[in-house]
Structures are given as C-alpha cells and as structure tokens.
Amino acid sequence: MSATPSHIPVLVNECLSLFADRHPKFFCDVTVGAGGHAEAFLSAYPSIVSYDASDRDVAALSMAKEHLEKFGDRVHFHHASFEDLSKDPREHVYDGILADLGVSSMQLDNLSRGFSFQGDDHALDMRMDVTKGITASEVLHTLREEELGKIFREYGEEPQWKNAAKAIVHFRRRKKIVTVRDLKEATAKVFPSYRLRKKIHPLTLIFQALRVYVNQEDVQLKVLLESAMRWLAPGGRLIIISFCSSEDRPVKWFFREAEKSGLGMILTKKVIMPTYEEIRKNPRCRSAKLRCFEKKFL
C-alpha cells in the first residue's frame, strides 16, 4: 500500500528492517501504488541505484511518478501486471522484491472504481487495470450459478456462497446488476440477521471474491512467486504483504516448498503483523501479514 493523503503504507519499518544488514543496489516494487514503500526504501537506502516500480493501475502509477519525482533516474516506472513482468527480460537481478497485495485505500476511496460497497450508484467495475479485462458486472451476468458460487466460496470464503449465487441469478432475470446498489438489492435476503449486526459489511467477502476473480489475482500471484525466484540475486529477499487468507496461504505454502527444495530460507518464521499502534492509526491494515524469503547464496 502506498502514501497519499488518504493512504498509508503498511508495515514500512518492518520492511526496511529486513534489509538492515544489507546495502541493496537493485530493487523491484511490483505494486508501487502511489509510492509509499518506494519513498521509504529510496530514502533509507541511498545504495539503491535502480528501483523498478510497476503497477497495473494506471492511476496509481501516475501518482507514483509525481510522488517519486524527487528521486530522479533512480526510479524506473512500468505499467504491468505480474504476468506482464514475467515475460519481460530482466536487465539485472534484484537484491529485493516487494509485493503489497490486494486493493489499496486509494482504490477503495475512489468509489467510481467499484471496489467499495459504499458507492451505491457507481458501476461494479473492480478492474485494477481499467484498460483491459471484464468488469465485475459482466461477471455477474455471464457466469452460471455454479460458477458464481465457486468464486464466492474459493476466493471469498463466503459461508452463504450458494445462496448468494442463487439470489444473483434470480435477480438478474428481471434486472441487470450494474451498480453497487443493484448487487445489494440482489443479495438483500441472503445474509442471516447476525451478519447484518456486525461492523463488517455482509458483502465484504462477496466483493473480495469478485475482485480476485476479475483481476485473476490467484493466477497473478502464482506467476509472481515463480518469477521472483528467477529475478532474485543470490541472497536477495522477497517480501510479500497479504491481506486475506486466500492471498497468504499460497505465499506461506510456496515459501515452505521453496525452503524444502533448497532454494533458500524463510526469514519470517513467524508471520509479521501490524502493531496495535499501527492499527490504531490505520485500521485498514489490521489484517496485513508480511512474509519474507531469502534466496540462497551461491
């Protein structure tokens, strides 16, 4: 996550401390956002001569370019997904790679992007890269009931996945689901009363599932993890920050398998989470989990 007036980068000090014993020269930030983590690394480590900053969100990348302008030619920007990056040849291997997964506060707060259930009259888009791909609204209208249920179950871990899918298919027969309000109406009777009384909005997991599917986040993450092992220099470190179990589980599993295979070692034997103080200042960071893997030296 990145720094703007409405957005605070998560676990910054913890990220920086993982390189305290190093003088990184080449760094890759595959989710630069508006540049919060990038600014911290470039300021803390003058040794970084090349910082590759990429993001699939063109709006975020534009903010990053403005925010990081003061670092001049130390920063190189790329509009790319993890999959796009995997196809491009690397000019050099990296001492550090950072990925801050999920949706940012910038994206949530911009209601026109459709990531938030607060923007009733806004379209259900949810694309990280608005230049390509299908929208969440299109997903809700083209997939069969069984397919929608699978998405809600696997990507959102929504207990009411079957009822939600059934309600949406029934609703779309008489009205197109275009806006956030439409989806709320379609699922109005799905959730049990105790879910409606909780602080967490009952549609949270449905929105999460749709976002993951629309942006192919599971596929993108798999590509990133596999590519990062090639991109890292010997002794290089990969930091992944995740915000839900569907993101954290594959990272945890991949790191374990990589360690067993002799590719390197897990530096975060115990996952790093935000302190109470950080959560107090930035409640949205409460579910963040940081894991770090070090590629073995030759």
Swiss-Prot record:
Q: What class of enzyme is it?
A: transferase
The set of disulfide-linked cysteines is none
MF (Gene Ontology) = rRNA (cytosine-N4-)-methyltransferase activity
One GO term under biological process is:
rRNA base methylation
| Record-listed E.C. numbers | 2.1.1.199
Q: Which InterPro entries match?
A: RsmH, SAM-dep_MeTrfase_MraW_recog, SAM-dependent_MTases_sf
Reactions the enzyme catalyzes: cytidine(1402) in 16S rRNA + S-adenosyl-L-methionine = N(4)-methylcytidine(1402) in 16S rRNA + S-adenosyl-L-homocysteine + H(+)
Residues given in the record as S-adenosyl-L-methionine binding sites: G35, G36, H37, D55, F82, D100, Q107
> What compartments host this protein?
Cytoplasm
Q: Which UniProt keywords apply?
A: Cytoplasm, Methyltransferase, rRNA processing, S-adenosyl-L-methionine, Transferase
Annotated GO CC locations: cytoplasm
Note the superkingdom of the native organism: Bacteria
One short Pfam family name for this protein? Answer: Methyltransf_5
| UniProt record similarity statement | Belongs to the methyltransferase superfamily. RsmH family.
Query: What is the stated purpose of this protein?
Result: Specifically methylates the N4 position of cytidine in position 1402 (C1402) of 16S rRNA.
Report what the protein is called.
Ribosomal RNA small subunit methyltransferase H
Which species does this protein come from?
Chlamydia abortus (strain DSM 27085 / S26/3)
